[in-house]
UniProtKB/Swiss-Prot annotation:
GO terms for biological process: single fertilization. It comes from Bos taurus (Bovine). SUPFAM superfamilies: Spermadhesin, CUB domain. Disulfide bonds join C14-C35, C58-C79. Homodimer; disulfide-linked. Keywords: Disulfide bond, Fertilization, Secreted. May be involved in the fertilization process. One of its GO terms (cellular component) is extracellular region. Residues 14-115 form the CUB domain. This is Spermadhesin Z13. SMART domains: CUB (SM00042). It is found in: Secreted. The lineage of its organism: Eukaryota, Metazoa, Chordata, Craniata, Vertebrata. Belongs to the spermadhesin family.
Amino acid sequence: DSTDGLLVKDKYLCGDLYGEEYGVIFPYLGLKTECLWTIKMDPLYRILLTVRDVHENCNKESLEIIEGPPESSNSRKICDTSHAEYTSCTNTMTVKYTRKPNHPAPDFFLIFRRVL
């Protein structure tokens, strides 16, 4: 399991706030169609986010990496990748997942780490 040794906080929540040094975010498997996970580190740190096994169809669902808090306009949409890494410019990063109603839940996971 590639999450061995990493903090796994209440798997499958639809949104949460993470402030730990590192951890894993799993997709939400319930009925909600939009989820926001915000990662916020101490001001001196940035965030390295590793995205694994994203195979979304962007017409029906999407995963968006937002630089900063949820209301920030600087974002990148991810549709299909087996592995990608993103480093924040600030100490805050938000991940937004949206899907159309009745579209099946995804099977991705995200690993975040605090970096200087």
